[in-house]
Amino acid sequence: MNRGVRTTVLLCVAFIALVLGALFYSVLREPLLDEVALREQGTFLLPARREIASFSLTDHRGVEFNNTRLAGHWSLLYFGFTACPDVCPVTLSVLAQVEQKLAAEGQPELLNQLQVYFVSVDPERDDAATLGKYLAAFSPRFVGVTGSHETLAAFAAQLNAAFMKVPDANGGYVIDHTGNIVIVDPDGRYAGFIKLPHDADKILMAYKSMARNG
């Protein structure tokens, strides 16, 4: 290899190392938010994380969804229904943006340690096929979950996720439900919630802070 080529190669290697170093430094120096700062951004962590009693639901692929599915990663659960006209699609769009931002930042570990679950509280209309088609419009990583009304009510109660069927003027019904995003830690414990209004950048920073603080 002649001197000119060697110099070019060394300069390219040095440039790549500089870029990677800058990226690594920018990730490391991101400020972690404490509980006070998290609350100011709408994320509320419980003083003591709560164990979740055994439950059994079904995901949109027909696979059982139970406590073991919540272990080993951070989970963000949103309770809603596919016929929801506003807050559900908006919230799922925001959560999809969180995934996209993690991917764009080149942080596959953090992305792989995050799982979004959409828990339908309208089992009469939201079967597996309906859930799967609905969620595909937001992210291929999202998992839809549902079950009997009784099982859903018991599961939601553990996570302070209230919902109620309300008759509408057309003889049908809508579902009144919480707008909070529920946080479950990698040990499968109820860790807190994120209040409305939801913002992708704030949720992203909250997630990074929780993931790095443990």
Describe the role of every protein-language-model region.
Residues 1-54, 213-214:
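N-terminal targeting signals for export/organelle localization
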Residues 39-75:
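Short extracytoplasmic
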Residues 50-52, 70-74, 111-116, 126, ...:
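Extracytoplasmic
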Residues 65-95:
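Short active-site neighborhood of thiol/selenol oxidoreductases, capturing the structured segment around
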Residues 75, 83, 112-140:
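Structural alpha/beta surface segment adjacent to cysteine/selenocysteine redox centers
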Residues 92-116:
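Conserved helix-turn-beta segment immediately C-terminal to the redox Cys motif
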Residues 117, 130-178:
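Short, internal strand/loop/helix patches
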Residues 167-214:
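Thiol-/selenol-based redox modules, centered on thioredoxin-like
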